[in-house]
Amino acid sequence: MKEYIKIATILPYKENYTFSKAQAAAIWVCDFFKFSEFKNSNFIFGNTKGKDYLTKNYINININNLKSKLSSSTNEYCKNFIDKTKDSNFDIIEIHNRPLVFNYLKKEIVSKFIIYFHNDPLSMNGSRSANERLKLLNEVDKIIFVSKWVQARFFNSLDRKLMNK
């Protein structure tokens, strides 16, 4: 009998999770989900305008201030995720391409965290500096890189011995 593990998968809020406009990370998550042994207890969260979602387990997180210069869309996304899932008690929270989402949620939610890097970590807020990446290595339960190139970029200016941490 398989252990029941409840998983929240959080897409970047700019990532579209629809058949008509899916982007790379959304397609990767959808394909990965199809073969997961935990697909009955895995919920995918994102901010998508369309309704033709790639999978039935998708839950939309609305963001009102998406283009606001006065407030943080990331903070609103995280706050709305917390509000929507406050009684869910996820065992694992998977975050795709958004180290800042991890930094926010880690302060508010007790769970194991996994970050997936699909793109250059040195171009993302929350993982640009060596200190930010060291902090992630120390605080995230697992970091997954979708390519060797992305992994090499993450460890740029860091001790290569940390790759096996």
State what each model feature region is.
Residues 67-92, 128:
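An amphipathic, basic-hydrophobic alpha-helix
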Residues 95-100, 117:
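Short His-centered aromatic/hydrophobic patch
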Residues 2-7:
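Extreme N-terminal starter segment of soluble prokaryotic enzymes
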Residues 31, 82-83, 126-143:
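Membrane-proximal helix-turn-helix segments that form the acceptor-binding/catalytic region
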Residues 11-19, 31-72:
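N-terminal strand-loop element at the rim of the active site
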Residues 134, 140-164:
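A short, active-site helix/loop in glycosyltransferases that binds the activated sugar's phosphate group
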Residues 50, 99-101, 149-151:
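Alpha-helix capping/helix-boundary segments
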